[in-house]
Amino acid sequence: MLDVKRNLTTMTDFYELTMSAGYLDEGYKDKIAVFDMFFRKVPDGGGYAIMAGLEQFINAVDSLEFTEEDINYLRSTGAFNEQFLDYLRNFKLHCNIWAIEEGMPIFPQEPIVTVEGPAIECQLLETLLLVTFNHQCLIATKANRIVRSAAGRPVMEFGARRAQGYDAAYFGARASYIGGCGSTSCVMAARDFGIPASGTMAHSWVQMFPTEYDAFKKYAEMYPDACVLLVDTYNVLRHGVPDAIKVFDEVLKPMGKRPKGIRIDSGDIAYLSKKARKMLDEAGYPDCTICASNSLDEYIVRDLILQGARVDSFGIGENMITAKSDPVFGGVYKLAAVREDDGSYTPKMKLSESAEKMTIPCLKKVWRIYDQDGKAMADLITMADEVVETQHGITLFDPIETWKECTYVNCTARCLSTPIYENGKRVYSSPSLDDIKKFCKAQVNTLWDEVKRFENPHRYYVDLSQKLWDTRSALLKKLSK
């Protein structure tokens, strides 16, 4: 079981430790900082991403502890003094952490996780936080694209063997399920996360027997209630489908059973599925489904459907489990504010030649604005102490092209920044994975179809409150001098 409370404390970049040692030496042990995780672009040029990975991050945070083995290793590097090693030995989390809940559509620039606490603690969480959310957000986003392309047809996650390591296969299956997949081929993920397991046979099963018919016959005898036959080992139309029909007639029919389906894993799937459908129907098996696999992605799935392919479900492997077409999520973790001794916050931001790469300072919240029909219209980032009131409507403006304004009436605002930890104590109860999946589907349905386009989606606006925009503008002017 990989999803247990394992100690991942040293799953960090070395410079997190060297910086932390410097903070301690400078007297910054209790200096309160605010960091945000956000991302700058949606993978595959999409209109939105899917939040995923919070449960695994929580499990890792709950298990933070520097063991004596860790301390001894760090001592052996020669980079750290005993004062810092003693600090690590007695390490305890005191941070406040907010996050957008799993399954929620998320957008560039908005903080999807915010950490407030002693600077050393914030720094030591960075790598662990990024590796967790960057992976699962990436895979959940890709899975959601593929599931939407299937237009209601079931999508099965088949990617374990092509994943980049055990954790990637295991947690990738979880993220794929959040994104909308109906099952996984990964037995460990199915067992631990309660995801339905799926899978029947490989070509090696067919090749192991004297004939394809013999292989099909044995499988049908063993699994009469779940008989799905792989029909492309030799020739789909000359041998595979005819042999499958023969086994259905000779083995399943006498038992009073019906076949579940056939799977096509190669060739021109649009053409083969049409021919196979005709053969199955004529043989009296209109209820026998056809599953397609073979390096599919959202574009191929969409094209198959547009071409009239008679495919009832899809098995997706490497293109989903690795997000092969755009395999880096690109989430970053940046300092947003530092709390002074008097309790006030000094905003911090990173400058850039590109406006899109300049960070947003201050301790903040993210709000989603919905119209009277429940459709998401825009997101609004505010200072943490602001409350968004919508009784009399709300006017939002583009933070870069400020002359672009839009006023929404009869709308509601939902705060997305959910408390996860308060002073190091967990205050959030995680929903079940099935509930996260349902939540994801419901929230994606609040987006306009134009935002969900695969090519050239409408840009969903993420705006700043007037107070936050003014603060950022003043800081930008000050830092640019």
Residue positions per predicted region:
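Buried, small/hydrophobic-residue-enriched core segments of structured protein domains
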Residues: 1-33, 41-43, 79, 85-94, ...
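N-terminal, Lys/Arg-enriched amphipathic/low-complexity engagement segments
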Residues: 26, 33-89
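Short coil/turn segments at secondary-structure boundaries
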Residues: 72-73, 141-145, 159, 452-459
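Short hydrophobic alpha-helical runs that function as membrane-insertion/retention elements
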Residues: 199, 291, 312-315
